[in-house]
Amino acid sequence: MSVRIKAVASQLPPHSRSTEEIIPLVEAWLAGQDERFIRKVIKIFGNAGVNRRYSIMGPEDVFAKTSFEEKNDIYIRECGKLAETSLQKALDKAGWQATDIDYIITVSCTGIMIPSV
């Protein structure tokens, strides 16, 4: 039995900002924290090698005070939409129907802080 990848597709979330645009939001989010901790977090954001960050939530919502459950509910709702769009793109690219698929591989990060897929 041979295994092969027939098609690969992706779907970016609707919101994006440059790292430079995100840094002030991170600083505001961390206000009141230890100054050394804030510098470390900002350094991580700045040196991550990520020029543009995509999110299922607008940056104001990402850094708003919400519970784990609220962010996770958003993650569950929104990642399904992204997955469905990405799957349809892959099916179209392959010229297949959903019933032709044997296996799907996904990569995901749960909604602990910043929900992403």
Give a label for each model feature.
Residues 51, 55, 108-117:
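Conserved catalytic cysteine-centered active-site region
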Residues 1-102:
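Conserved active-site "lid/cap" helical segment
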Residues 102-108:
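Short glycine-rich or small-residue beta-strand-to-loop segments that form or flank ligand, phosphate
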